[in-house]
Swiss-Prot record:
Protein name per its UniProtKB record: Large ribosomal subunit protein eL14y
GO molecular function term, any single one: structural constituent of ribosome
Keyword Ribosomal protein: yes
Keyword field contains Ribonucleoprotein: yes
Gene Ontology annotations for the cellular component aspect, listed alphabetically: cytosol; cytosolic large ribosomal subunit; cytosolic ribosome; endoplasmic reticulum; nucleolus; plant-type vacuole; plasmodesma; vacuole
InterPro entries linked to this entry: Rib_uL2_dom2, Ribosomal_eL14, Ribosomal_eL14_dom, Translation_prot_SH3-like_sf
Keywords: Ribonucleoprotein, Ribosomal protein
The family this protein is said to belong to: Belongs to the eukaryotic ribosomal protein eL14 family.
Gene Ontology terms: biological process: translation
The species this protein was found in: Arabidopsis thaliana (Mouse-ear cress)
One Pfam family, short name: Ribosomal_L14e
Gene coding for it: RPL14B
Length: 134
């Protein structure tokens, strides 16, 4: 199995750190071996170092350095947001954000639910063991 996420025009990437942390951006041009020109509907087009980007599996069909309107249309046509939210990586980040926003009482309720679930699983396992040995 080879590497499939290449730096290419139209590749959607996730920003790892910095002021745009967590945003999905599209590579619209490659400046040199270390930097790319990236753009997104809710931000200005900027140069970004490849070390700040994590390439995703999503690729949209765009020309080199498209206008903002063309980029937005291409992203909507490719359904980038839904593809990202349905991917395991996107779901994991959504869960992390949701957990980070929990307050103490919410964490307490989750702890009680986990204890209750573990108790039910333990009871069912004991029933199955009893059936096997009987």
């Amino acid at each position: 199995m080879g590497f499939k996420r290449y730096v290419e025009i139209g590749r959607v990437a996730l920003v790892n750190y910095g002021e745009d942390h967590g945003k999905l951006v599209v590579i619209v041009d490659v400046v040199d071996q270390n930097r790319a020109l990236v753009d997104a509907p809710d931000m200005e087009r900027i140069q970004m170092n490849f070390k700040r980007l994590s390439l995703t599996d999503i690729v949209i069909d765009i020309n080199r350095v498209p206008k903002k309107k063309a980029l937005i249309e291409a992203m909507e046509k490719a359904d980038v947001k839904n593809k990202w939210e349905k991917s395991s990586w996107g779901r994991k980040l959504i869960v992390q954000k949701r957990r980070a926003n929990l307050n103490d009482f919410d964490r307490f309720k989750i702890m009680l639910a986990k204890i209750k679930k573990a108790g039910v699983v333990r009871q069912e396992l004991a029933k199955l063991k009893k059936e096997i040995t009987a």
